Each structure stands twice: as C-alpha cells, then as structure tokens.
C-alpha cells in the first residue's frame, strides 16, 4: 500500500495522530520537499517518528515514480508531504498511476496553506479564484491570473517560489510590478510563517507591502478581489492592520 500523509503547515508536530500511526506502522517512509517545505530537518523527523526517513528528489516523483509504486506492491510505503498531499498535482498523478497498477492507496490529509489563509486573514474561502505561483524566473502568468480573478471579483492566492531559495513577499511584489506597473496599486495581504504561532499578517497596497519586513520565510500572498464583504474588511482591519481606506472596497 502507498499512503500519502500530510505533514501540515510548519513542523513535524503538525502531523495528525492518524498520520503518525501510519508512519510508525510503515515499512518504508519517504518525504518530498520540492512542492513545499517544512521547518523540520530529516534528522528531526527521524527522531520524532523513531523511523528512518528518506528524502526524494523531484525526479523521483515526476520521472521515476514507478520505483516508489513498485516498492508499495509488497510493502507498506508512506510518502510524507508538507501541507495536504493532494494540493500538488504531482501527487494526484502518482496516486492515479499506483491505482492503475493495482497498488492500493490511502490519503491522510493535513492542514494546507490554501485554507489556513482564510483563518489568518478572515477572507471568505468561497471568494477565491485560481491560484498561481510567483517564480524567480519572471512570468506573466501570475499577473494574468490576478486579472482574470479580479474580472469575476475573486481573490488570488499566490504561492512564492521555493527554489533555489524561498522567495520573500518583497521579491514577489517586485516581480509582479516589473511585469505590470499597475499591480502596485492593488490591495493584497502578505502572510509569513503560517502555522508557526509567530505569524505576520499585513494588508496594504502592493507597493507598500514591499517595504514591510515580514521576517523569515515561508511567505505567501493574497491579492484582493475588486470588492470585499463587510466582514472581510473588519477582519483585515483587526487581523492584518489594513488601512482604513480599504473600506471603499466594501460592497
């Protein structure tokens, strides 16, 4: 069997009890840090789980996933994934391939940044559109996604690139403005270290967010829709120090 276990948002202690049981009962345990990161080292995980943990590279998942699946034919194999296992399409593809080859699969979900941003900001989950990634290699894609979402009055969750190093909100804003200068006037929320207990959440225009020191990664951003529900505005004022002028978006 191949079991996908979500590790949650911050460190190894965010794993669920059910996930912990699966790890301790497994024959082999693997972890991947390509699609996301966790602030726990392999050594810390091994000490916590009392089990050897092998880190997989991107190629192990995308080009050579058949090797993992072959091992799961005769053994209980766990793949640890930061956040929730099925947010990344890579893991859905592995699950599909495994099932087609007769290998049973199981998913043990974990907390995801996709839902955590709603709790940290007060933004309504149903008002989010398509998400995008701001990468170190500049691309028009995030700007296009923001514009498309705003055309339907939806918020945009922006993941920030992790390779070769985690991107900061400041760098992400610079990339967006470099692609489209009009981005600087949009309101957004910057979120740092979700799930750590030491989160930083700030709301302002993009050009002002760039000047804020959010501290160490991991960082994400939400570019706001054209309008806000009055409760979203109240929450942003309270949770994210949003400027009073943001009230003009309430509809």
Swiss-Prot record:
Keyword flag Repressor: no
Catalytic activity of the protein: 2-[(3S)-amino-3-carboxypropyl]-L-histidyl-[translation elongation factor 2] + 3 S-adenosyl-L-methionine = diphthine-[translation elongation factor 2] + 3 S-adenosyl-L-homocysteine + 3 H(+)
Organism: Archaeoglobus fulgidus (strain ATCC 49558 / DSM 4304 / JCM 9628 / NBRC 100126 / VC-16)
EC number: 2.1.1.98
Family: Belongs to the diphthine synthase family.
UniProt pathway: Protein modification; peptidyl-diphthamide biosynthesis
Enzyme class: transferase
Originating gene: dphB
Pfam families: TP_methylase
GO molecular function annotation: diphthine synthase activity
Function summary: S-adenosyl-L-methionine-dependent methyltransferase that catalyzes the trimethylation of the amino group of the modified target histidine residue in translation elongation factor 2 (EF-2), to form an intermediate called diphthine. The three successive methylation reactions represent the second step of diphthamide biosynthesis.
Lineage summary: Archaea, Methanobacteriati, Methanobacteriota, Archaeoglobi, Archaeoglobales
Record SUPFAM superfamilies: Tetrapyrrole methylase (SSF53790)
Residues involved in S-adenosyl-L-methionine binding: 9, 84, 87, 112-113, 160, 194, 219
One biological process term in Gene Ontology: protein histidyl modification to diphthamide
InterPro entries per UniProt: 4pyrrol_Mease, 4pyrrol_Methylase_sf, 4pyrrole_Mease_sub1, 4pyrrole_Mease_sub2, Dphthn_synthase
Quaternary structure annotation from Swiss-Prot or TrEMBL: Homodimer.
Keyword rRNA-binding in annotation: no
Keywords on record: Methyltransferase, S-adenosyl-L-methionine, Transferase
Protein name: Diphthine synthase
């Amino acid at each position: 069997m191949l079991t996908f276990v979500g590790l949650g948002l911050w460190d190894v202690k965010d794993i669920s009890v059910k996930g912990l049981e699966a790890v301790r009962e497994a024959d082999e345990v693997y972890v991947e840090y390509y699609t996301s990161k966790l602030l726990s080292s392999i050594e810390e995980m091994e000490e916590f789980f009392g089990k050897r943990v092998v880190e997989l590279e991107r190629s192990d998942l995308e080009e050579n996933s058949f090797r993992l699946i072959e091992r799961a034919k005769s053994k209980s194999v766990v793949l640890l994934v930061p956040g929730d296992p099925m947010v990344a399409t890579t893991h859905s593809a592995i699950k599909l391939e495994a099932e087609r080859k007769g290998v049973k699969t199981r998913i043990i979900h974990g907390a995801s940044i996709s839902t955590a941003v709603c709790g940290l900001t007060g933004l309504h989950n149903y008002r989010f559109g398509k998400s995008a990634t701001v990468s170190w290699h500049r691309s028009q894609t995030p700007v296009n996604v923001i514009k498309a979402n705003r055309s339907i009055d939806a918020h945009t969750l922006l993941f920030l690139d992790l390779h070769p190093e985690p991107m900061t909100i400041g760098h992400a804003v610079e990339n967006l403005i470099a692609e489209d200068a009009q981005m600087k006037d949009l309101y957004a929320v910057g979120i740092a270290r979700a799930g750590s207990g030491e989160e930083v959440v700030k709301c302002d225009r993009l050009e002002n967010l760039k000047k804020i020191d959010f501290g160490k990664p991991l960082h994400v951003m939400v570019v706001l829709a054209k309008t806000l529900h009055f409760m979203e505005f109240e929450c942003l004022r309270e949770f994210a120090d949003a400027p009073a002028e943001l009230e003009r978006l309430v509809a």
